[in-house]
Amino acid sequence: MLAKRIVPCLDVKEGKVVKGVQFRNHEIVGDIVPLAARYADEGADELVFYDITASAHDRVIDKSWVSRVAERIDIPFCVAGGIRTIEQAREKLAFGADKISINSPALTDPSLIERLQEEFGRQCIVIGIDSYYDHISDSYKVKQFTGDEAATKDTQWYTQDWVEEVQKRGCGEIVLNVMNQDGVRQGYDIEQLSMIRSLCDVPLIASGGAGTMAHFKDVFALAKVDAALAASVFHKGIIDIQALKRYLRDNQIAVRV
């Protein structure tokens, strides 16, 4: 059995790590490299960095901190934010990132997924999906440019359809960001994640809602995801990564300790 992965997420804005609730009202929580080093030292399996306003503001990730992170940590990490071209992706990988993730640019130009996987291989192409449960229509819908409240907009895609589309185009992994659960620490959306898991032939990473160790256990045991991403519980010291891994191991969840 493949070990489940614990993935701290670092949202980056103007050179600092920030965290919001349901993608709004972001507050500064720390500096990029020290936080990355802390999580690597605590036993994280990999890290994800999102430059949350890069796509909305039509710019790309600052390569300087990417190289500094690569120099300091010895675990895989993924970067996302404003990557629209092969050249931009190549630069981030050259500066030390192991994977690149695209979200809003893929919605604007789905063929970008195919071009990236043809150039670099699908193993390092991650698709982030910001999924919002719409109570009126009782459906899951994909939103775009979510890093900036003023720029956030609806798309024509239902989450299930977009999950199938990005796989057809060659993504190697999917991060499902459940917007309704983000930052509220009430647990992962097991129902939605289970539904998406049934459509996924690639690794699925759950994002949004972690508040307790039991939430991690449930998302692995019930939704069968491959990895669980979380931010605020790690940033605020609510959950220690090594303690979490011991808890998961004691509950028959395979993890690297």
UniProtKB/Swiss-Prot annotation:
Its EC number is 4.3.2.10. Keywords: Amino-acid biosynthesis, Cytoplasm, Histidine biosynthesis, Lyase. Gene3D superfamilies: Aldolase class I. The active site is at D11, D130. Disulfide bonds: none annotated. One of its GO terms (molecular function) is imidazoleglycerol-phosphate synthase activity. InterPro entries: Aldolase_TIM, His_biosynth, HisF, IGPS_HisA/HisF, RibuloseP-bd_barrel. It is found in: Cytoplasm. Pfam families: His_biosynth. GO terms for biological process: L-histidine biosynthetic process. Its main location: cytoplasm. One of its GO terms (cellular component) is cytoplasm. Belongs to the HisA/HisF family. This is Imidazole glycerol phosphate synthase subunit HisF. It comes from Shewanella piezotolerans (strain WP3 / JCM 13877).
